[in-house]
Amino acid sequence: REVVREAIMLDRSETGVRLRCRSRTPFPDKVRLRAPRLGLDIMARTVWQTGFDTGLAFEM
């Protein structure tokens, strides 16, 4: 089952991203990150969550 969450990408590097969501609902361990305008469609793992912010590491 796919769940879609909108978020603001606060920071991006070669290895991952920092996102800010509207809710504090925990992310699953693994997610598919899609941002078509940025050319991103990649699997990532949740590394940390604090409040509304989440850090994801790209699966290389």
PLM regions with names:
Residues 1-60:
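Structured alpha-helical
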